[in-house]
């Protein structure tokens, strides 16, 4: 296992060294150091087994970094500038040997992870800029574009396996069920889409919700589907009940721009206000704040292969790492204790709030809409 994902070793001062040749001890941090890019990242992904992080930026460049809690050991391994416009999404293959990227230039690229060599390019893969990417298995991938188009690709073949256009707006995000049968899509038209990729057919669209659906993920062991929205609301659907929502949970956030599951009940959201919120699903609670990009929107979130680190990208051109240990230890009780109004949002890591951070006055989420939330939760907390 990589050192970063192990417990940090205890310092051993038993070894004697020549004072004249002693070097300053290596500092071990709680999280890797921030990575500073030349442009904001618009795609982010962790390697499935190694301590590597890939990022694609709005200039079309793709980077792969090795990260470590040892100070000075987080480094760029390589970069690629093959895309002509913004790189919108990046994803590692299941075996970790390939990196797939998609771009506003309508192209799909497959890169070798070790050297960054471009192995395959599918030019004009869509008629519109590509916005989202999901790898189904080692050979098959799905892409969604700005006009609502969905395409399924087999890297061993020429041309798409499936080409659908049921949505009226851009495809913001996609998710897959464990059986790799149903592809779920979140769209700017406010609808959740369901596509059977085994039979290569369209199944249904949900009722449109208020605002764009910006993200989608499975929760509660696949029994629930959660969608984030541009209105700052999380919409919940029952599995096999995709036509209409079963519940909704409004955060006090301008929007939910990205979302990543941490456990079967906990997820993290990134918002325009720069705050990364930890949210429990059923019972619906904002648990606290994992971190923030001060005054800058959070565009992407990703969870490391060991689950220890959350990475975030903001318009401040920084990639930040957050320790998930404290969040994973949180226990959310079904009973809601009425908190004092005006209390601060609970910090879930040592570096959540900086001393000069104007977000330090951020108030507890949802207190003035408590009654509405409790009403919405009633009768739906059980699966």
UniProtKB/Swiss-Prot annotation:
Q: Name one GO cellular component term.
A: cytoplasm
Q: Which protein family is named in the record?
A: Belongs to the WD repeat WDR55 family.
Protein's name according to its UniProt entry = WD repeat-containing protein 55
Checking Pfam families in the record gives: WDR55
Q: Where in the cell is it found?
A: Nucleus, Nucleolus; Cytoplasm
Task: Return the Basic and acidic residues bias intervals.
Answer: 1-11
The record's annotation in InterPro entries points to: WD40/YVTN_repeat-like_dom_sf, WD40_repeat_CS, WD40_repeat_dom_sf, WD40_rpt, WDR55, WDR55_POC1
Q: Which UniProt keywords apply?
A: Cytoplasm, Nucleus, Phosphoprotein, Repeat, rRNA processing, WD repeat
Q: Where is this region: Disordered?
A: 1-33, 362-383
The UniProt entry annotates WD repeats at 36-75, 82-121, 125-163, 166-205, 208-247, 250-289, 293-332
Q: SUPFAM superfamilies this protein is in?
A: WD40 repeat-like
Physiological role: Nucleolar protein that acts as a modulator of rRNA synthesis. Plays a central role during organogenesis.
> In what ranges is there compositional bias, type Acidic residues?
12-21, 365-383
Modification sites for Phosphoserine: 14, 354, 382
Answer whether the UniProt record assigns the keyword Phosphoprotein to this protein: yes
Keyword rRNA processing assigned to the entry: answer is yes
Q: Which GO terms describe its biological process?
A: rRNA processing
Record PTM Phosphothreonine, positions in chain: 378
Species source reads Pongo abelii
């Amino acid at each position: 296992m990589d050192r970063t994902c192990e417990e940090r070793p205890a310092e051993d001062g038993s070894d004697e060294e020549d004072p004249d040749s002693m070097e300053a001890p290596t500092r071990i941090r709680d999280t890797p150091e921030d990575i500073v890019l030349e442009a904001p990242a618009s795609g982010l992904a962790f390697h499935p087994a190694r301590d590597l992080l890939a990022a694609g930026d709005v200039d079309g460049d793709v980077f792969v970094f090795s990260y470590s809690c040892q100070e000075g050991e987080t480094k760029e391994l390589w970069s690629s500038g093959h895309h002509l416009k913004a790189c919108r999404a990046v994803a590692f293959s299941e075996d970790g040997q390939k990196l797939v990227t998609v771009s506003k230039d309508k192209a799909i690229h497959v890169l070798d992870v070790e050297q960054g060599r471009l192995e395959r390019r599918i030019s004009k893969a869509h008629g519109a800029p590509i916005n989202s990417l999901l790898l189904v298995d080692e050979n098959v991938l799905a892409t969604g574009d700005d006009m609502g188009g969905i395409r399924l690709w087999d890297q061993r073949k020429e041309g798409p396996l499936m080409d659908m256009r049921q949505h009226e707006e851009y495809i913001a995000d996609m998710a897959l069920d464990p059986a790799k049968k149903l592809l779920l899509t979140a769209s700017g038209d406010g609808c959740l889409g369901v596509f059977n990729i085994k039979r290569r057919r369209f199944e249904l669209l949900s009722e449109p919700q208020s605002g764009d659906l910006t993200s989608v993920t499975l929760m509660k062991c696949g029994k629930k589907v959660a969608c984030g929205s541009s209105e700052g609301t999380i919409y919940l659907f029952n599995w096999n009940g995709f036509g209409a929502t079963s519940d909704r949970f409004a955060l006090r956030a301008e929007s939910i721009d990205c979302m990543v599951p941490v456990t079967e009940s906990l997820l993290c959201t990134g918002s325009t206000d720069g705050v990364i919120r930890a949210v429990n699903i059923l019972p619906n609670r904002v648990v606290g704040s994992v971190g923030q990009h001060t005054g800058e929107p959070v565009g992407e979130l990703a969870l490391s292969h060991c689950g220890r680190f959350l990475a975030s990208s903001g318009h401040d051109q920084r990639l930040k790492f957050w320790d998930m240990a404290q969040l994973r230890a949180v226990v959310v009780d079904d009973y809601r204790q009425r908190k004092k109004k005006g209390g601060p949002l609970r910090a879930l890591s040592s570096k959540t709030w900086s001393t000069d951070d104007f977000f330090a006055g951020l108030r507890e989420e949802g207190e003035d809409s408590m009654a509405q939330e409790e009403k919405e939760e009633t009768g739906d907390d059980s699966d």
